[in-house]
């Protein structure tokens, strides 16, 4: 998208995906005006940060209005932290729509970095902290960015100290339930997108690495069925789309149906009760802290059961600027 100019630090802004909403919130930018879908935004993690409040009722769910251009005029944001290619590929905007909103309302600033598998994305990708650094420039929040980097590096250091040797790490398969209920969209850890960051950081062996099963992407929603799942036979199964579920809700919705299925019940992960919620698709730095800690305790309970991988109070201080 080239250079983007801002008249000042945005006071009113919107994201579409929770990754950018979480980045801006972490940098002291406040709440997003809108979000793609409330159910996919893990705002419950903010409840664990002392003194931090997030009012979901003040956030417009953009998909309810079909992500129509009129919503952007109503929000009247100073900045839109959205990759405009998402609007043209997912929501039938054309370039004139993008240009009109940019001119009439405010600039677009974003890059779709959830995954790296879409053919239309033929420009540079950023990892989570590269994108966060650019967002910190927008909000003039270098001090907050540096503090988040320190926390992140401390977490990774703790992980490295506690991880079991490579040959003691399980093979894992990451999936998203398809509409049929008996099929899944596959996701590969080596895709490089920020949505799979925690699995790479935790050194998991991708069960798909030795197969020809591809990574989910726009325009190719190939699935794996339960028989294929049994053939791959992962030791750990990570299931998305249940980020906000309680443990009992997840077991009722996912684990029990797998146990009751003749094919799925033979999968090693199902037999070993190693089927876990994979959290949300999108994550900024705060959500990633929680995702990583939960994944570590789920997958490596002996190594991480007593571990607190990040300081909640420190995160709250960074958000408020009181550090």
Question: Which residues make up each language-model segment?
Answer:
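Short, structured coil segments at secondary-structure junctions
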Residues: 28, 101-105, 202-203, 271
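Structural recognition of the beta-strand scaffold that forms the well-ordered cores
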Residues: 14-15, 33-35, 79-83, 108-110, ...
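Solvent-exposed loop/turn segments at secondary-structure junctions
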Residues: 18-22, 38-41, 85-90, 114-118, ...
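Acidic/histidine-enriched, beta-strand-rich ligand/metal-binding domains
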Residues: 54-59, 215-224, 228, 241-309, ...
